[in-house]
A protein has these predicted regions:
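Acidic/histidine-rich catalytic neighborhood of metal-dependent amide-processing enzymes
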Residues: 89-117, 135-140, 171-292, 317-325
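Extracytoplasmic/secreted proteins, especially bacterial periplasmic and envelope-associated proteins
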Residues: 6-9, 13, 30, 34, ...
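Soluble non-cytosolic domains of exported or imported proteins
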Residues: 4-8, 22-30, 216, 220, ...
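Short beta-strand element of the alpha/beta-hydrolase
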Residues: 126-131
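N-terminal capping segment at the start of a domain
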Residues: 1-27, 42, 201-208, 266, ...
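A non-catalytic alpha/beta surface segment that caps or lines the substrate-entry region
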Residues: 21-121, 141-179, 183
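Short glycine/serine- and small hydrophobic-enriched flexible loop segments
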Residues: 16, 223-230, 373-377
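Active-site-adjacent substrate-binding region
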Residues: 20, 50, 276-381
Length: 381
């Protein structure tokens, strides 16, 4: 298929003409303003809501990892303090990763980001179509040879974090074992030191990527699906979020400020659909998995069967990284993500090769048809 569709023109404008779109940057705002103009032109009423965000998740986790390493070192001189510090690091990590209590992010310097909310009608929506406009920063942890093992590395780091206070507690209750346990505790501490190096390297040496697949492709699908739904004058919100890559700040702000309106809405999130095996998620979550709405997964399966190339759409569990869908999902709202994967991760994920030339327009067109079919099925219920 020739790369000439209106969907592909959105990808080109966002990823090539605007280029990298860091969280809270002018380029991110330009992308949102472009989307606003596109949606207004087909009859949507729009609103830009602002909020504060960090520019990256890396420094938050860097601080947490340092707290845990300090806890391991304290085991040599003051074990009770090591236990307290180690447990505190675990709680901070869980709070940050689940977004339920991101205490560390609150102390990181902030920028202003925005969400774009577009509505066809007043009142509560039945459907929310979402995609994030910002793009990410590269780093060695996202090198193509390492990215496929990202979740494994994440779990090793988490359990290393957990191991430090556990070992310190054992030292407290069994002092005779202190000497060998202190050396054993150095193993998780070294694992976390490597994690700290990766996080710092990303911030100090990484580059902001163009984000053609992640996530100009998803925004393109949202805009084109919105255009196709415009004539229905239906209770649909199209939400283009900011600051997803920093820690889901945009979607978090949307849910916090509009929960009453969104409590009965279906969420269809679109992320990284520009290359790879197109999938609909059945479970998401990095630390613990939450099943996506069975109603939406069945709907995605049935709607995919109506597509000419339906065999190219598969169910999947996506546990590699949290995306915007995590925010409504953890709050019990019916949610699903459409995403394309290769070896279990998005293609060219957070890497400089995430450019327009590496996006497959056929993937995008298939996703548009799937979103349109799902929305009309929900509206006709």
């Amino acid at each position: 298929m020739q790369q000439t569709s209106s969907a592909f023109s959105h990808v080109t404008y966002l990823a090539a003409e605007i280029g990298p779109r860091p969280c809270g940057s002018q380029n991110e705002l330009k992308a949102l303003q472009y989307c606003e103009n596109q949606l207004k032109s087909v009859g949507y009423k729009t609103e830009l809501q602002s909020f504060k965000t960090t520019q990256s998740f890396s420094w938050s986790y860097f601080i947490i990892v340092l707290v845990a390493i300090l806890g391991a070192l304290l085991s040599w001189v003051k074990v009770d303090s090591a236990v307290a510090l180690g447990l505190w690091a675990v709680l901070l990590f869980i709070g940050e990763n689940t977004t339920l209590s991101p205490l560390v992010s609150r102390i990181i310097p902030k920028k202003t980001s925005h969400n774009l909310i577009a509505k066809l009608t007043e009142g509560k929506p039945k459907i929310v179509i979402s995609a994030h406009a910002d793009s990410a920063k590269s780093g060695l942890m996202f090198h193509p040879r390492l990215a496929k093992n990202f979740r494994l590395g994440f779990l090793i780091s988490f359990w290393s974090l957990v191991a430090i206070p556990i070992i310190a507690i054992i030292i407290l209750v069994a002092p005779a074992l202190k000497s060998p346990l202190l050396y054993i505790e150095l193993v998780p501490a070294l694992v976390l030191a490597y994690e700290a190096f990766q996080l710092a390297e990303r911030e100090l040496n990484g580059t902001w990527v163009c984000g053609a697949n992640d996530n100009a492709s998803g925004v393109s699908v949202a805009l084109e699906a919105a255009r196709k739904l415009a004539s229905a004058n239906a209770p649909v919100w199209v939400v283009i979020t900011g600051a997803e890559e920093a820690g889901l700040f945009g979607m978090n702000h949307l849910i916090r400020t509009h929960l009453v309106d969104l409590i009965s809405a279906y969420f269809i999130n679109i992320d990284n659909v520009g290359k790879g095996q197109l999938c609909y998620t059945t479970k998401e979550g990095m630390l613990f998995g939450i099943r996506c709405s069975q109603q939406l997964t069945r709907l995605a399966e049935n709607c995919a069967k109506s597509l000419p190339n339906y065999k190219s759409v598969k169910p999947c569990e996506f546990r590699v990284m949290s995306n915007d869908s995590w925010i409504p999902l953890i709050r019990g709202l019916p949610t699903i993500t459409l995403i394309a994967l290769e070896n279990g991760v998005p293609v060219n994920w957070h890497w400089p090769t995430d450019t327009v030339e590496n996006v497959d327009v056929e993937n995008i067109e298939t996703t548009i048809k799937l979103v349109e079919s799902m929305c009309y099925s929900l509206l006709n219920k």
